[in-house]
Amino acid sequence: MFNVGQAISRNCQGITRRELLQVGGLSVLGISLANLLRSEETRPLTGLGSPARPRTEKSCIFIFLEGGPSQFETFDPKPSAPMDIRGPYGNCATNVPGTQICELLPMMADRMDRCALIRSLTGFTGGHTARPALTGSFNSLTTYGAVVTRLKGAIGDMPPYVHLGGKIFNTPGIGGGILGSACDPIEIRDPFGRQVNLQQFSLSADVTPQRFHQRRELLNAVDQARAKANTGAAIERMDTFHQRAANILTSPIVRNAFDLSQERETLRERYGASHFGQSLLMARRLVEAGTRFVQLKWYDWDGPWDIHGFNSTGIERMEEELMPRFDQGLSTLLDDLRDRGLLASTLVVVVGEMGRTPRINHWGGRDHWGNLLFALLAGGGIPGGTVVGSSDAHGAAPATFPVQPDEFAATIYRTLGIDTNLDPRIRPFIGSAAPVAALV
């Protein structure tokens, strides 16, 4: 993951740190971020053109339920199936006529008119790999957030891409992928405390604020002298990149966005005293401040979704741990975004890396199942109350309108204002896939 102040070996285009220093001149600020910003701006992706037309600015909160949530105990119950398939829980009506979900989601049942469900997501591996869910491809390590970062850039001083929740399991290297380290997210492992440790946004221990500003003054003098010798457009923009790097290090807006103690205790309690709930609150603060893409991984500390049944991981965990935290946190996020006028411009996505087996095993749990899983989308212009596709009677496979990972990816990109038909820069990441028509 990208950390301000650490050496970065490669950027989006694969050039080395030495080459970056040659392009950027003296590294008197003591940071490599300005070089990364500069290289990202001045070198377009090989063979890819400029955007076709202006886009509406949107953000995304992408919630990854690592471990593989069961479709039966969430958004696709099967009340008419045999007991060993439907499980011990019933279904409940929602505020969308004809749409029912599991009774373990009473708060979300009252908010489904703001959500769209995909009940026919298919073509996943059935294993613990995040690639299809986070990239739309089995082979890619380039996440949605990295692509959005590369195509849209930063808003003000805020980092464009933030990951909450620690490393993704069993998928080493996922992040910037082919776009390089400059498109990796800022990683915040645990936002549960009242204030996050923001080492990423701090000066090195041996660099005082006074020394930092002295370096900036020296750099400005060097840049002015160099500009007189070379008036090219790239040289003229150097001050901008160093200013952006310095702003990230010193901006109170950036630090405040990561400071949960700024929130009312009553609102923090509404989100829930869990890592998941507090991460959702931080995600809202980030998109409100200008972050384009927040990728939020479900925390193992809140209980794993991998409910095989052994080691006390059976279906009862859904009722006792997982669903109460999920239901409380997600429903509060949707309310909070709506109340702040952010829901229309913020896409919320919920998905795991797989579903669970139709039949409950002899341990009282469900095993891996890649042939069918659900996804929930809300906000960002998504038509609420929509249900895309359906599963068969046993929840084993799509019965209607199967949605593949690349089609899911195309839907996300289109909703975020990236024209999947006209913008040639997106094609390397989705191929010929089209968005789900009912959702865009």
Model-inferred region functions:
Residues 1-440:
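Ligand-binding pockets and gating/stacking loops
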